Each structure stands twice: as structure tokens, then as C-alpha cells.
């Protein structure tokens, strides 16, 4: 199979999986990204031109705001990918886990730590020019999924992600990077629409950020989970099975 056909096949599977699982993924995304949307809205209200400080301090404030906005746009994606991994890989004979069951299985501390460190290394990569941020973004994109799928430690998740991506860097990059860019573009469009309908206050920004992330984050997370499973299978010959469609709810038989 050529690289192009393999890549197109991955995108087709992402689309099919997203459509099949949207009824359960979108509420899960709402739980994660509505609170984070408020933080995004606050950070996007920063206006360095209004600060009564010297140009040096204004530049520092601008750089700080840039880092904060970059971090806020990425934070939550790794955590959400871990939650999606639980939902998409439950045993075939079992019903899909409920929100409460997913909440009970999530490794909160490890995923939050992985999420924070992932954002940190990308922010550090910004100071090493964009190439550094791009490399870190791709090599560690699978960290959250492997932490949940294989119960790694925080550092073990980063190491495992690097191992899986190594040798497949451009394949992974060709999936996660365009999805991140397109997702950001859609998110910006939703925020703009929200401002045009609701004004320019923090409520409009919060609504736009939340809705944009709820719509786009599942695409990225589904892609991460599918790539993780594919690369596990390629490397070791086996991987957790992807549950392609939610099982229909079967009514209990009468006694």
C-alpha cells in the first residue's frame, strides 16, 4: 500500500469513526471543553495595547499572552484523547461505557500531568523556533492515548509515544498537524460567529470557544486513538481492538 493510499485510508476511518461515535463523543467533549472554554475566553481578552507600561514590559506581556493562548488552545486535547481511548476500545462483547464509567476509569492525575507537560514542551519548542514545537507536537501526540490504553506512567507515556511515532513521523504529522490547523480555523470561525451574534463580551467568547472545541476536538482525539492502535499493531503485531460502532441498546427480555 502506498503512503498516499494509507493516509487517505486513515482519514476515511477517522471520518467513519467520528460519525459513528458522535452521539457519545460530543457530550464527553462538552464536559471537558466547556470549563476550558471559559479559560480560553479569559486569555483571549488580553489586550497589551491597553497596558500602561513601557514597551519592554508590553513586549513581555505580549509574549506571555501568546504563550498562554497557545497553551490554552492545546490543553485538554491530550486529556480528551485518553478519555476517547477508553470509550473506543472497550471489549467487543460489552456495551459502551457510560459517562460515569468513563469518569471512573480515567487516570486523572497522569493525564493532567501529561497534558501540562505536552503543552510545556511545545511552548518551549516555540522558543526553539517553530520547528522545535512541530517536532514535539508530533512525537508526543499519542501520549494521552497510550497512558490510558497501556496504563503507562507520565514519563512512560511520552517515551511510548516517541517509540511508536519514530519511523512514522511524517505519517503521523500528515494526520495530526492538518487536523490541528483546520480545527483551529473552524474554532476561530465559530468564535467569530459567536461574537457577531452575541457581541464582544466574555460570554460570547466563552460560547464560541466551547462550541468550537466540542465540534473539533473529537476529530483530533479519534485520529490520535486510531494512529496509536495502528502503530501498536505495526510494532508489536497486536493492539487493543477498536470498537467501530456503539452497540445498540437491547431491551431486557421479560421474565
Which residues are covered by each model-predicted region?
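Hydrophobic alpha-helical segments of integral membrane proteins
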Residues: 33, 39-41, 86, 234
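Interfacial aromatic "cap" segments that immediately flank transmembrane helices
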Residues: 2-35, 101-125, 136-188
Amino acid at each position: 500500500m502506498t503512503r498516499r493510499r494509507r493516509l487517505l485510508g486513515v482519514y476515511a476511518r477517522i471520518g467513519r469513526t467520528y460519525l459513528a461515535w458522535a452521539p457519545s463523543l460530543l457530550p464527553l467533549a462538552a464536559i471537558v471543553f466547556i470549563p476550558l472554554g471559559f479559560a480560553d475566553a479569559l486569555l483571549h481578552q488580553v489586550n497589551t495595547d491597553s497596558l500602561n507600561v513601557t514597551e519592554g514590559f508590553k513586549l513581555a506581556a505580549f509574549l506571555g499572552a501568546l504563550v498562554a493562548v497557545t497553551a490554552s488552545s492545546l490543553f485538554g486535547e491530550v486529556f480528551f484523547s485518553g478519555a476517547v481511548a477508553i470509550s473506543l476500545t472497550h471489549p467487543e462483547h460489552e456495551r459502551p461505557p457510560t459517562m460515569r464509567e468513563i469518569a471512573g476509569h480515567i487516570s486523572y492525575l497522569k493525564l493532567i500531568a501529561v497534558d501540562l507537560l505536552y503543552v510545556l514542551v511545545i511552548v518551549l519548542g516555540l522558543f526553539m523556533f517553530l520547528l522545535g514545537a512541530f517536532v514535539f507536537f508530533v512525537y508526543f501526540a499519542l501520549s494521552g492515548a497510550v497512558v490510558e490504553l497501556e496504563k503507562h506512567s507520565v514519563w512512560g507515556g511520552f517515551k511510548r509515544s516517541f517509540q511508536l511515532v519514530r519511523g512514522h513521523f511524517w505519517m503521523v504529522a500528515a494526520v495530526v498537524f492538518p487536523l490541528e490547523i483546520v480545527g483551529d480555523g473552524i474554532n476561530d470561525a465559530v468564535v467569530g460567529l459567536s461574537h457577531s451574534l452575541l457581541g464582544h463580551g466574555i460570554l460570547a467568547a466563552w460560547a464560541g470557544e466551547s462550541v468550537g472545541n466540542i465540534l473539533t476536538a473529537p476529530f483530533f482525539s479519534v485520529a490520535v486513538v486510531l494512529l496509536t492502535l495502528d502503530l501498536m499493531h505495526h510494532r508489536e503485531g497486536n493492539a487493543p481492538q477498536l470498537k467501530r460502532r456503539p452497540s445498540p441498546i437491547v431491551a431486557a427480555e421479560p421474565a
